[in-house]
Amino acid sequence: GVGFKAGVKDYKLTYYTPDYQTQDTDILAAFRVTPQPGVPPEEAGAAVAAESSTGTWTTVWTDGLTSLDRYKGRCYHIEPVAGEENQFIAYVAYPLDLFEEGSVTNMFTSIVGNVFGFKALRALRLEDLRIPPAYTKTFQGPPHGIQVERDKLNKYGRPLLGCTIKPKLGLSAKNYGRAVYECLRGGLDFTKDDENVNSQPFMRWRDRFLFCAEAIYKAQAETGEIKGHYLNATAGTCEEMIKRAVFARELGVPIVMHDYLTGGFTANTSLAHYCRDNGLLLHIHRAMHAVIDRQKNHGIHFRVLAKALRLSGGDHIHSGTVVGKLEGEREITLGFVDLLRDDNTEKDRSRGIYFTQSWVSLPGVLPVASGGIHVWHMPALTEIFGDDSVLQFGGGTLGHPWGNPPGAVANRVALEACVQARNEGRDLAREGNEIIREASKWSPELAAACEVWKEIKFEFPAMDTL
């Protein structure tokens, strides 16, 4: 007879190993598992470990040709989720051998590739990953990182200011370039292509790049400050994307942009390598993230997508605004903001961080706060995000009643006032409105902005809770 017993397997015999001591080289994952009724949590956790590593649904004779113990994923711990009836956190350890070096694509294909459609589970969410230094070291990471970016821009001791050019679709290249110039001239550091501005019939990419470069150089000459515009290089093919990045380099501009989730991790990593080799900064937009991360019970939490981006490479990434939202969300957001910027992040479940993560000096990424923010938010943003961040006011600049340059002036004055107040030891959380009011006495542009946006709020209950 053959040396194995055919039939459908009980996963937990092989893949649930509560005594396992995790190794420093393992990739560790925390999954939020919602089993189907009647499926015990150990079996569900083991099934996740199996299906995302070596397992298949039945015994196969080729199993005998490998060392299962060396290659299998292991569910090594399960804990119930407080306040949920039938939900568990399953911790899975994957041996490093299972992953291709320097490939975020392969890491995700392995860990989340197949298992999310698994019938024994009602829902599954990847909450966090621990990437071991041995794997991190196979990635280049961000093209430049926070310190190099500050040195390139010669801007220190404050957050950077940006603005997304609106209306996002329909402007001609010349009018688009004019809006870029006006915002930069007024005092912003950066302007931004919207994520869906690629190369459409009303504005082809090459024309846009040219007029934006002209706007940058004119604003630089007049202000004596270094300026940038995130030229979106996202395209339908990797070749076309690199072609756009090459043209940006030829124009001598400082920064390009990519939509890393719609563009894909393979394209993103290629672009990040090009950017480091050619001295371009890389701004990353997270279009499509909410499709993946918004459901509490199913999908992938954004902190995992943020870690993946730091491996794949990007110098800025959009990461929520916190402002006007609830407390719990603030802690969770700051959790992954720290993951992006710091060298080491300690395990802290109150902030949604399941594992201590060391980045072994991989450069950090600047978090970008963007979407529905205006001058009244400036004290809170300065306090929450600190100096190492990019604050982006699209409508909050272009919506100014006197036009774009005064809109930019208002934001810059508000920021400088908040930074100065903080440096003088004032409490931004408590005195924020007062600080903005005082500054607006000296700046009619800011006073007008304060008047327009005094009633605007975007308050809804938090989605992202522990």
From Swiss-Prot:
The keyword Cell division does not apply. Gene3D superfamilies: Ribulose bisphosphate carboxylase, large subunit, C-terminal domain, RuBisCO large subunit, N-terminal domain. It is an enzyme of class 4 (lyase). The active site is at residues 166, 285. It is found in: Plastid, Chloroplast. Its EC number is 4.1.1.39. Pfam families: RuBisCO_large, RuBisCO_large_N. Mg(2+) binds at residues 192, 194-195. One of its GO terms (molecular function) is ribulose-bisphosphate carboxylase activity. Substrate binds at residues 114, 164, 168, 286, 318, 370. Heterohexadecamer of 8 large chains and 8 small chains; disulfide-linked. The disulfide link is formed within the large subunit homodimers. This is Ribulose bisphosphate carboxylase large chain. It comes from Drosophyllum lusitanicum.
